[in-house]
Amino acid sequence: MQAPPSFYEGDTLEVAKKLLGQKLVHIVDGIKRSGIIVEVEAYKGPDDKAAHSYGGRRTDRTEVMFGAPGHAYVYLIYGMYHCFNVITAPVGTPQGVLIRALEPVDGIEEIKLARYNKTDLTKTQYKNLTNGPGKLCRALGITLEERGVSLQSDTLHIELVPDEEHISSQYKITAGPRINIDYAEEAVHYPWRFYYEGHPFVSKK
């Protein structure tokens, strides 16, 4: 079942950890593409110097962060790679969780074509399908078109994985500093990256 609106409310760090093991789903041209979330990063603007919304900075790009939890915040890095975030916290509190890595589940042929334009992949290429924020967006067909979309929609949502199928029994959740935020002064050291230790699709050990 889809995660209800209440799933995204509450402390952003707790929501980030709850997202691990759940399934990110995007329906593209009627075909379901999905993956199990294995790595995330929490961003707690306006006090977090690593957040786009640090200091309450409000722009056309970040406006969705100030809205209701349970919406998609998508942005571009380096002018070419999309990053997908889940908005958390109450209206007016611009916080969110970046989805950093997935284990592919549904629509794997479409995911392969989206990433490599072929379906016969090496083991290394397969592991690289969704082990990074830009890679998973390309794989699932997530673009700026999805910015601001409610995660209650039929085409883009988080699917809750039943306890008996949840991979949390196989992997330990580890916390550590977030990646590629050297500009963020003391926030560089916040242990707000959460991932399944030892999972093959985690982007960085």
Curated annotation (Swiss-Prot):
<keyword id="KW-0378">Hydrolase</keyword>
<dbReference type="Pfam" id="PF02245">
    <property type="entry name" value="Pur_DNA_glyco"/>
</dbReference>
<dbReference type="InterPro" id="IPR036995">
    <property type="entry name" value="MPG_sf"/>
</dbReference>
<protein>
    <recommendedName>
        <fullName>Putative 3-methyladenine DNA glycosylase</fullName>
        <ecNumber>3.2.2.-</ecNumber>
    </recommendedName>
</protein>
<dbReference type="GO" id="GO:0006284">
    <property type="term" value="P:base-excision repair"/>
</dbReference>
<dbReference type="GO" id="GO:0003905">
    <property type="term" value="F:alkylbase DNA N-glycosylase activity"/>
</dbReference>
<dbReference type="GO" id="GO:0003677">
    <property type="term" value="F:DNA binding"/>
</dbReference>
<comment type="similarity">
    <text>Belongs to the DNA glycosylase MPG family.</text>
</comment>
<keyword id="KW-0227">DNA damage</keyword>
<keyword id="KW-0234">DNA repair</keyword>
<dbReference type="InterPro" id="IPR003180">
    <property type="entry name" value="MPG"/>
</dbReference>
<dbReference type="InterPro" id="IPR011034">
    <property type="entry name" value="Formyl_transferase-like_C_sf"/>
</dbReference>
